[in-house]
Regions:
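A short beta-strand-loop-beta hairpin characteristic of the jelly-roll/cupin
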Residues: 55-66
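Short phosphate-coordinating micro-motif centered on Lys-Gly-acidic
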Residues: 37-42
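Cyclic nucleotide-binding regulatory module and flanking cytosolic helices
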Residues: 1-27, 75
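Short coil/loop residues immediately preceding or within conserved phosphate-binding loops
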Residues: 26, 44-45, 66
Length: 97
């Protein structure tokens, strides 16, 4: 099993078969370094499952970015329009969307 699948199954307590069924319904996307996939101002609802790369989740307070967490292979990001966080790629990334 690929590393991102192992981590995803372990972290979210789901079976590999269930994850593969979900991934079959999703599109594999390639993201460039510096790409914003979610922000407090983006009216989008989406789910990303990270296959490779590093992403930065942050919030902006008083004009300064404050790190919330870093994401990598096997992490999932649920982006929704009421989020106060932004997510930006720090490296080239591959994800399911």
């Amino acid at each position: 099993m690929e590393a991102y699948l192992k981590k995803l199954c372990f972290e979210y307590q789901v079976e590999e078969k269930e994850v593969k069924e979900l991934l079959a319904r999703m599109e594999r996307v390639y993201l460039d370094k510096g790409e914003t996939i979610a922000s407090a101002t983006m009216p989008e609802q989406s789910l990303y499952i990270i296959v490779s790369g590093i992403l930065h989740t942050f919030t902006t307070q008083q004009g300064e970015d404050k790190t919330v967490r870093f994401l990598s292979e096997g992490d999932a990001i649920l982006c929704y329009n009421t989020s106060k966080h932004s997510v930006k790629t720090l490296t080239r990334c591959v994800a399911y969307y």
